[in-house]
């Protein structure tokens, strides 16, 4: 279900932001629209961020969940306060849903 996957992605992004805030580390998000994946890294060295309960820092989305547009690009930085450097949008299935990342608050939500 597309809504369940959107909620899963929101939860993962929020968990990564909060985890890095607690660890006093920067967090980086990369979105690959061609592969329909997103990748989490952290620290200035951009080490893989494997969240508790996850086996990888790369998340591959199911075939019905297509990232059709994203201005996140490579290594969107969230500072140690969880604030992204810019407001960004991830579009799912050509305007079916969008995930918004708001600067400077770090608020992450879906429409």
List each model region and its residues.
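N-terminal helix-rich module
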Residues: 1-14, 18, 22, 26-111
């Amino acid at each position: 279900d597309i809504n369940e996957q959107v909620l899963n992605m929101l939860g993962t992004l929020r968990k990564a932001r909060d985890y890095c805030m607690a660890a006093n580390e920067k967090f980086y998000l990369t979105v690959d629209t061609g592969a329909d994946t997103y990748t989490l890294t952290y620290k200035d060295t951009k080490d893989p961020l494997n969240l508790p309960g996850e086996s990888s820092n790369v998340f591959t989305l199911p075939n019905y969940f297509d990232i059709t547009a994203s201005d996140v690009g490579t290594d969107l930085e969230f500072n140690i306060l969880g604030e992204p450097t810019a407001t960004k949008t991830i579009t799912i299935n050509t305007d079916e849903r969008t995930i918004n990342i708001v600067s400077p608050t770090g608020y992450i939500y879906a429409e």
